[in-house]
Amino acid sequence: MSHQVKGLKEEARGGVKGRVKSGSPHTGDRLGRRSSSKRALKAEGTPGRRGAQRSQKERAGGSPSPGSPRRKQTGRRRHREELGEQERGEAERTCEGRRKRDERASFQERTAAPKREKEIPRREEKSKRQKKPRSSSLASSASGGESLSEEELAQILEQVEEKKKLIATMRSKPWPMAKKLTELREAQEFVEKYEGALGKGKGKQLYAYKMLMAKKWVKFKRDFDNFKTQCIPWEMKIKDIESHFGSSVASYFIFLRWMYGVNLVLFGLIFGLVIIPEVLMGMPYGSIPRKTVPRAEEEKAMDFSVLWDFEGYIKYSALFYGYYNNQRTIGWLRYRLPMAYFMVGVSVFGYSLIIVIRSMASNTQGSTGEGESDNFTFSFKMFTSWDYLIGNSETADNKYASITTSFKESIVDEQESNKEENIHLTRFLRVLANFLIICCLCGSGYLIYFVVKRSQQFSKMQNVSWYERNEVEIVMSLLGMFCPPLFETIAALENYHPRTGLKWQLGRIFALFLGNLYTFLLALMDDVHLKLANEETIKNITHWTLFNYYNSSGWNESVPRPPLHPADVPRGSCWETAVGIEFMRLTVSDMLVTYITILLGDFLRACFVRFMNYCWCWDLEAGFPSYAEFDISGNVLGLIFNQGMIWMGSFYAPGLVGINVLRLLTSMYFQCWAVMSSNVPHERVFKASRSNNFYMGLLLLVLFLSLLPVAYTIMSLPPSFDCGPFSGKNRMYDVLQETIENDFPTFLGKIFAFLANPGLIIPAILLMFLAIYYLNSVSKSLSRANAQLRKKIQVLREVEKSHKSVKGKATARDSEDTPKSSSKNATQLQLTKEETTPPSASQSQAMDKKAQGPGTSNSASRTTLPASGHLPISRPPGIGPDSGHAPSQTHPWRSASGKSAQRPPH
């Protein structure tokens, strides 16, 4: 390239010199300017000589005198001619200079283009060798005088934006992975290479800083999202269970995790606003009777049997209602503990109601937004289920098991949709199953009521055994343990789909637990009314005892009055603490029964089947007893009703929520271990939604039913006179009215009184019901419209598929017909060409010999003319278009039978 450029330069210089020597008018150098000046001097000297010759002629012919007018006129004319010649010479010189400059500029551009093309790869190789940043190389090139034009910058900017869009949309491209990686690397290299050229100086540095911070921010958000995913408790355990047991079993553990989070918030609310202020700022233990163990109970207050029944020191601790004092303010902060206790009790139900409804709403929105379709279910699972980013063998095994389980779920759904059944037999069996279950529910309710009534008689006796003290809790736990399997056995008669059967099973167990719980509450309320009647007597006895004590003691001004120890003061029964103790016992006994059932019914059963199967008479794994399946309905309903007891009992026992948090925490680890080690998947696995909206609906109903007894005790029953933060008041809600009157301005009290008017509350409730009805109708209409649109989309998809299939068949048919027609047309064209061209003498002789050969008939030797009418048909002279026979011809590459033969080489 350099030799060519040098040759072009030498040729250009030689041409310039030649033009200067020849005195051509197109020279463009200093020599040209000098030559033009020489020509101007010659031109100036030429008219002088002409003038001399003319003067000689004039003198010879009689020229005018020097001062004559004719002499003056000729002088003026000569002067004008000289000025015109000078102006023409200057104009010629300027035009020649412009032409020379233009030629020099075009020559420089022609010689600079190959130089620039050669310098670009040199510069890139140099930058690669030095391994310097791209921005420094661009800055050095800009400082060297090679700045980019505006058009080039615009082109670079456009290409950079295109590459960025390609990087952003790389995931959605239907390309192979190798092509994606190649294109991604090339796009990233291009962006890094040319992005810095869009700025200069400080602007360039600011742009680079912004890009760096943007990349850092994207990386931080990605890492933070990964961190949040890792912070989700028990997520990997639940995914492991889902991969082996299906989404139905995993839905229980998701629900258990959600319940743990709700109880953790409730525990923080109660512990931070009620228990901690009373312990830190309230009166210490032993200072007043309600915080002191009675003298008669001090001897056995620390025995294990007493503490196990939540008596002794536990009864007079901050875990229960009776420990809290009724002082309006406590401590140096003047903390209003009674008001805080009341508001926290109300807030527990308010927060639970809001969080349950919000969770149901979010799950509903997520389920409607998914838009799942039943088209090509198995194809989608087969070709799109695997995650290609898995790099761990254990994770790959879990994913494999999860895909297998999802196939089983889809197969069950397909079988159930295509199943035919005897409708009359099915109806009879379902009616029989419901009758048996109703009998079981009535029997369990009567049994609980009978046991509670008998426990009231045991409470009046002195020497009571451990079973008689805990008979109610034991009976309720046994009913909760044995009734769900009985219901499941009866439900086998109904032959429902597994998902529908689970809902019926949950509803029946829900009715069982609800009946047991409300039977227990009714019997407990009878006990509460008896204790309230006894409190009036104890209250009068206490007052008379203190009056006689102080009157019978002799004292004067010099002798102080003997103090009465808090342990010796007579006290009432404190029915709120008694109710809290009953709920505490129920919670602990239910937890123990659940753990014992898992150990005996699942773990020991699995060990027996596993190790005794080799030496037993029959196959223990396939027959009786076999491995246990995870009881979804029983565990879910047990969790829901345990939470209902927590909601009811937390008002009377603030420490109950903390015990429930520990119970849920241990249950998660214990049940996860038991499921993975002792249980097997269900024989008929089925798909369950991870949203758990059915569970949430049951939980919302239990929350509403748990609110009713607490609201009844707050609004109707008088509190105990000697224990709890509401002692000394007629009703518990009086603390709210007292706080408004003493701590708020008068007009706020009037506003609260107006808002509490039943004439305003009842219309507000009716308006809320109307709004709920309206929104429900709107949601139903929208769901129907959504279903119709989905059907329309499905129909359009089927029509489009049918059109595509028809079009594909047509194109396939055309593609099959096209080669035949093309070959046929080519043959016909060749025939036409041969007919139009006159054959040579040798060819005509050969044709005549073949036509006259033996064994050849006239029809066989006849050439078939093309069938298409648009092709030209040549006929020999003497044969018209209407003649009856064609000439006897045969092409040299066509056999007598009409089949094409291989053409001989020339």
Swiss-Prot record:
Residues 285-336, 453-508, 715-750 are extracellular. Residues 1-150, 800-906 are annotated as: Disordered. One of its GO terms (cellular component) is stereocilium tip. One of its GO terms (biological process) is regulation of calcium ion transmembrane transport. It catalyses: Ca(2+)(in) = Ca(2+)(out). Detected in fetal cochlea. Keywords: Cell membrane, Ion channel, Ion transport, Membrane, Transmembrane, Transmembrane helix, Transport. Signal peptide: none annotated. It is found in: Cell membrane. Its main location: membrane. Residues 820-846, 854-866, 886-900 have a biased composition (Polar residues). Disulfide bonds: none annotated. PANTHER family: TRANSMEMBRANE CHANNEL-LIKE PROTEIN 2, TRANSMEMBRANE CHANNEL-RELATED. Forms the MET channel composed of TMC dimer (TMC1 or TMC2), TMIE, TOMT, CIB (CIB2 or CIB3), LHFPL5 and PDH15. The interaction of TMC1 and TMC2 with TOMT is required for the transportation of TMC1/2 into the stereocilia of hair cells. Interacts (via N-terminus) with both isoforms CD1 and CD3 of PCDH15. Can form a heterodimer with TMC1, TMC5 or TMC7. This is Transmembrane channel-like protein 2. It comes from Homo sapiens (Human). The lineage of its organism: Eukaryota, Metazoa, Chordata, Craniata, Vertebrata.
